Amino acid sequence: KITIGQLPGAASNKQLIEQIFNGTNYKVVYEPNMEDYLLCHAAFVMPAAFACYKTDGDLKKLRGNTAYLNRLLDANIEGYRAIRNAGHAILPKADADFEGEKYRKTCLRFFKLMCATSLGKLCASDHAMNAIDEMSALNRDLKKFFDENGAAYPVWQALEAEAGRYLQ
């Protein structure tokens, strides 16, 4: 699955995207609000990157550590809350009820699966460990966004501190 879209104020490129992927096996989701989608994606990905850095890329070290995995969720929720409170949409729409129990259970299951199988290496640690500069910049930009919008993000900050030497 690939999510593609446009930034605010840009002309729609939905038809072009459909033409490009026509006849392929890709499932394409067109998102007309990529700015908010990418903000939300970053708020979900960064806590997972913190976990990768805490474990030097071996997420299996967190297998069974439900307390830590719940902190990842708490940081994600802090990020989503800051994004929502700044007037942005929570995307994908399935995440809109991010403070609900269903969201928490679904994400916790996903994080547990990532830490118990090679899915974590494939979905998170390979990228995080090979894109430290990118993750560092993303983290800096998100913290700047949080600060500019008066958001509290103590769990995020604690996880960041535990990430150790990786983030610059």
Where are each of the predicted segments found?
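Internal alpha-helical scaffold of NAD(P)-dependent oxidoreductase catalytic cores
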Residues: 1-91
